[in-house]
């Protein structure tokens, strides 16, 4: 039964709760917390709602239904109790907070209604915008400018100053009206910060925009979370109007939340709920010796073929193991790039990945700016306040960032993902806001060939509109070519079977697969065995040895690919929920790395593997030809002001360089700023 709060002295009930409530270990739970609060001069006492409910149902009812009235009463009682324990506490801390956690009333952002206003509720979401910290007056000190008074007083007398600054009309000391002057040095201030919380991407209904809610953080809650953090906020819903309320004002108000407590999710993928039954099913699946192949078969099962690519996408979904060292952090996420002819189902596969991944953000290159991908400082039109706003890579922190048509991005926007892909952070310094946000996400991107279809005779850097600085950051690159052949009948039959509703056998349903991936990412951190370590080391050393056989040998592999091998090996182990990376995992990782190097990292002229095709965009053979042409330009420019094109062509052909290659290299060098056209058809080295 409801009991109005005025019939009970909740101060006494609350103090009795704090001093007598015992936890599971039969210890005075809150006495210990209060002692710690006093000793370390903290400002907040965390109270579990379930404890209050088991102690006094009436107090629990008032806390969640009459929060605006009851919370200041409880905070006042707590402060008085602390001063009895330690009177010196007042010298350091003027205000103490009661933070209630574990509220049963958890509401989805899009289901907030007017009936929730004034009540204590909990909301899950992502923090997308944060303002710099400001100061709010919660107790102003005024001076009455009147010859008969001139006294100072605090205002408001019995409560806190609301969001809009109030001035007294009559002096509480002398009872007369007059002029009142604010005394800033005696006014009490509190740290204040505005933020915006948004629905999590996986909760937004298809075809709808994510809902947002403005939240207010005060005192020790400011800067407790950063844009991109997944948070659980508990607070009181209230209403406000942008402009002062006056006659003729619109009778429509915005809802905002004054936060009582905020919990930043430290757990990986805690939005995926895995029951005991799910866990048993996952462990049973992992016992299947062919589980990896079953998982790969379950990736975009409606798309025919592309086994190696699906294998790589599965590896990216599981990821490796990130390592945090004293001076750096080594990423565990696996980045994948798909370059494919039109109609090879690139976008379909990316869409599937965004659905099956426990946490994913899908975006397209054409519709993405640098700010939209990483972070931005945004100015609000109404108030002129600056917000730090998180972009797609920050929102995908801990999951997968899916970027379709990455080749369509503008160069100035594409540069923004360099740091996010390797360091997995996003740094921003604009409008006085300097921040570094986490972007610990695997990037899976797709793009179309520059010339419409992939030209096998050209290196990968010539086939896609991406600079080598980005290409080199992808662990694996796959090329999908639409080539007519013997498999066309099988392809046609497969597509017709899909359209006729025939299901593919032996695949794992999408919901189970999502939970399996979440479980592996959350709980499985395999260690590399000495056998696997030796196999990876031998492969790396053997490839490097081939690079040093002759002075003309290209570089076959770099330490960047070695790190990728380790990540891929760990991902194979995670797919089977294994605690160790075995020889089999290392062998599979080496096979897929070798496939990548032999299909993408090949110098088309020599036919040899040359990792510089990806790392720098120019294989060793092209670099050597470029150096010869530079020497020719230097020697020709000695006798005259610059080297004429016809003379360069003549001398370069004499040393065995084809005319078409010479013209292409001259164009590339001019674009790169190595040479410039001093006169028409006459070049000089910069």
UniProtKB/Swiss-Prot annotation:
GO terms for molecular function: ATP binding; ATP hydrolysis activity; helicase activity; identical protein binding; single-stranded DNA binding. One of its GO terms (biological process) is DNA replication. Changing residue 404 to A: Loss of helicase and ATPase activity. A motif (Arginine finger) lies at residues 472-475. Coiled coil: none annotated. Changing residue 346 to A: Sharp decrease in ATPase activity. Almost devoid of helicase activity. GO terms for cellular component: MCM complex. ATP binds at residues 340-347. Inhibited by the cdc6-2 protein. The ATPase activity is not stimulated in the presence of DNA molecules. It catalyses: ATP + H2O = ADP + phosphate + H(+). Changing residue 359 to A: Loss of helicase and reduction of ATPase activity. Changing residue 189 to D: Predominantly monomeric and loss of helicase activity. Changing residue 329 to A: Impairs helicase activity. Presumptive replicative helicase. Has ATPase and DNA helicase activities. The latter preferentially melts 5'-tailed oligonucleotides and is stimulated by the SSB protein (single-stranded DNA binding protein). The active ATPase sites in the MCM ring are formed through the interaction surfaces of two neighboring subunits such that a critical structure of a conserved arginine finger motif is provided in trans relative to the ATP-binding site of the Walker A box of the adjacent subunit. Belongs to the MCM family. This is Minichromosome maintenance protein MCM.
């Amino acid at each position: 039964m409801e009991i109005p709060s005025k019939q009970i002295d909740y101060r006494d009930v609350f103090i009795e709760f704090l001093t007598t409530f015992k936890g599971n270990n039969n210890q005075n739970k809150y006495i210990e917390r209060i002692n710690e609060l006093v000793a370390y001069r903290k400002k907040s006492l965390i109270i579990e709602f379930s404890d209050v409910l088991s102690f006094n149902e009436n107090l629990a009812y008032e806390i969640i239904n009459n929060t605006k009235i009851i919370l200041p009463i409880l905070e006042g009682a707590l402060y008085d109790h602390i001063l009895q324990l330690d009177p010196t506490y007042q010298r350091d801390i003027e205000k103490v907070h009661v933070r209630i956690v574990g509220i049963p009333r958890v509401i989805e952002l899009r289901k907030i209604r007017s009936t929730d206003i004034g009540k204590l509720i909990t909301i899950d979401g992502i923090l997308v915008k944060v303002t710099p910290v400001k100061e709010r007056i919660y107790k102003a000190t005024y001076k009455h400018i009147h010859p008969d008074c001139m006294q100072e007083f605090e205002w408001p007398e019995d409560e806190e100053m609301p969001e809009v600054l109030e001035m007294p009309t009559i002096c509480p000391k002398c009872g007369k009206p007059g002029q009142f002057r604010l005394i800033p040095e005696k006014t009490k201030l509190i740290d204040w910060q505005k933020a915006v919380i948004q629905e999590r991407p996986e909760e937004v209904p298809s075809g709808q925009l994510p809902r947002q809610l403005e939240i207010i953080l005060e005192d020790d809650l400011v800067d407790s979370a950063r844009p991109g953090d997944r948070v659980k906020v508990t607070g009181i819903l209230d209403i406000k109007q942008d402009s002062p309320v006056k006659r003729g004002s619109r009778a429509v108000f915005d809802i905002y939340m004054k936060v009582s407590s905020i919990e930043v999710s430290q757990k990986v993928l805690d939005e995926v709920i895995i029951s005991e039954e799910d866990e048993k099913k996952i462990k049973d699946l992992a016992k299947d010796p062919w589980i990896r192949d079953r998982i790969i078969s379950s990736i975009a099962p409606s798309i025919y073929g592309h086994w190696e690519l699906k294998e790589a996408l599965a590896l990216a979904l599981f990821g490796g193991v990130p390592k945090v060292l004293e001076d750096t952090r080594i990423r565990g996420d696996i980045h994948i790039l798909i370059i494919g002819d039109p109609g090879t189902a690139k976008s379909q596969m990316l869409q599937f990945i965004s659905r099956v991944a426990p946490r994913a953000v899908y975006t397209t290159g054409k519709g993405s700016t640098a700010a939209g991908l990483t972070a931005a400082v945004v100015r609000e039109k109404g108030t002129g306040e600056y917000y730090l706003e998180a972009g797609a890579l920050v929102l995908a922190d801990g999951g997968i960032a899916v970027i379709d048509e990455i080749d369509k991005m503008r160069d100035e926007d594409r540069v923004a993902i360099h740091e996010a892909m390797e360091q997995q952070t996003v740094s921003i310094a604009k409008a006085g806001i300097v921040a570094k946000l986490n972007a610990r996400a695997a990037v899976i991107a797709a793009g179309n060939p520059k010339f419409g279809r992939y030209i096998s005779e050209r290196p990968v850097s010539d086939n896609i509109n991406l600079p080598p600085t980005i290409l080199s950051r992808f662990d694996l690159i796959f090329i999908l070519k639409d080539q007519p052949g013997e498999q066309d009948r099988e392809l046609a039959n497969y597509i017709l079977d899909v359209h006729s509703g025939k299901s593919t056998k032996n695949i794992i349903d999408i919901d189970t697969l999502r939970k399996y991936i979440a479980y592996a990412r959350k709980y499985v951190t395999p260690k590399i065995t000495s056998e696997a370590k030796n196999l990876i080391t031998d492969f790396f050393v053997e490839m490097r040895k081939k690079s040093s056989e002759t002075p003309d040998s290209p570089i076959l592999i770099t330490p960047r690919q070695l790190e990728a091998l380790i990540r891929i090996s760990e991902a194979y182990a995670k797919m089977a929920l294994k605690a160790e990376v075995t020889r089999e995992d290392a062998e599979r990782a080496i096979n897929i790395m070798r496939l990548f190097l032999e299909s993408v990292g090949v110098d088309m002229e020599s036919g040899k593997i040359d990792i510089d095709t990806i790392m720098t965009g120019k294989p060793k053979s092209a670099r050597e030809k470029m150096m010869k042409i530079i020497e020719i330009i230097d020697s020709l420019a000695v006798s005259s002001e610059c080297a004429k094109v016809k003379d360069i062509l003549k001398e370069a052909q004499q040393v065995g360089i084809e005319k078409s290659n010479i013209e292409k290299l001259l164009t590339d060098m001019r674009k790169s700023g190595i040479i410039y056209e001093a006169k028409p058809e006459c070049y000089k080295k910069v």
